């Protein structure tokens, strides 16, 4: 009788955890809604991938777009081109169609509003040889900057996969990149952060590229929640332009939040 009770209790416990596991498994097809998308969740404490969707896309390289601002920030802080999070560049007066871009911009606002012209002030100061050296040390994607100093990361020659983005962010969050500790600390400080109703923090960077016939969206970030500490990457593509007044990177960020909510992590 006692063994029967123990067996029944064990089966109930197994059933409970099975139900819990099913409840926290995202419905990826419903979330991406026809988009060719992928997702990676890396558990920093366990040191392994906790969840991955569409592995083949996670292995493909794409233009990093504005997610590359993280690498630019690391280089610029390390070289002293940016002194701190308040380093400000003056607006050149050119109307770029956005109030947040048409003004003097600090390093913090550069990432917050994803100001492309701020990046384009930094990369010529770094120079091609220096950037190539850093990218080799970072082991960043295909390291190809032949597309030009002011746009090689913007739908051009530089490519990186979602899996490679996770590896790069892993080195950043573990303070293992070949730059100064101060450069890594300041870079992490200026990464935009959101706080969920449950108190989880998600610090990350969007990336967008689009033409008249296609869209590419990125979100890569760091999640700190009661269940642990994770790195996340979302990437998707569509054979159509984004909706009016919509940036694919913002869509990718919302997709990431939805996935994490369904996993009960955010």
Regions found by a protein language model. Give the residues of each.
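Bacterial N-terminal signal peptides that target proteins for export
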Residues: 1-9
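Bacterial N-terminal signal peptides
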Residues: 8-16
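Beta-lactamase-like hydrolase cores
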Residues: 19-63
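Structured C-terminal helix/loop/strand segments within mature extracytoplasmic catalytic/sensor domains
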Residues: 24-31, 124-129, 174-200, 204-266
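Active-site SXXK
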Residues: 61-85, 110, 232
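Short, well-structured active-site flanking segments
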Residues: 78-93, 179-184
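Acidic helix-start/capping segments at beta-turn-to-alpha-helix junctions
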Residues: 87-103, 109, 115, 126-127, ...
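Mid-domain, small-residue-enriched loop/turn segments at the edges of structured enzyme/sensor domains
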Residues: 99, 106-107, 119-169
């Amino acid at each position: 009788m006692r063994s029967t009770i123990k067996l029944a209790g064990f089966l109930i416990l197994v059933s409970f955890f099975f139900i819990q596991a099913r409840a926290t498994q995202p419905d990826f097809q419903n979330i991406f809604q026809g988009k060719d998308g992928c997702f990676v969740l890396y558990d920093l404490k366990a040191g392994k991938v906790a969840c991955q969707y569409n592995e083949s896309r996670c292995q493909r390289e794409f233009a990093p777009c504005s997610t590359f601002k993280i690498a630019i920030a690391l280089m610029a802080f390390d070289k002293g081109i940016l002194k701190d999070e308040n380093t400000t560049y003056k607006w050149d007066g050119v109307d770029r169609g956005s109030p947040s871009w048409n003004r003097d911009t600090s390093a913090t606002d550069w990432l917050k509003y994803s100001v492309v012209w701020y990046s384009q002030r930094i990369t010529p100061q770094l120079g091609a040889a220096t950037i190539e050296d850093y990218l080799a040390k970072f082991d960043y994607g295909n390291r190809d900057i032949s597309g030009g100093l002011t746009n090689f990361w913007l739908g051009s020659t530089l490519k990186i996969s979602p899996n490679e983005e996770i590896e790069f962010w892993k080195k950043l969050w573990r303070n293992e990149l070949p730059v100064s500790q101060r450069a890594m600390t300041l870079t992490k400080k200026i990464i935009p952060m959101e706080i969920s109703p449950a108190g989880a923090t998600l610090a990350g960077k969007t990336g967008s590229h689009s033409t008249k016939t296609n869209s590419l969206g990125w979100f890569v970030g760091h999640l700190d929640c009661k269940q642990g500490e994770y790195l996340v990457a979302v990437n998707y593509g569509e054979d159509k332009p984004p909706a009016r007044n919509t940036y694919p990177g913002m869509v990718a960020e919302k997709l990431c939040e939805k996935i994490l909510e369904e996993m009960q992590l955010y």
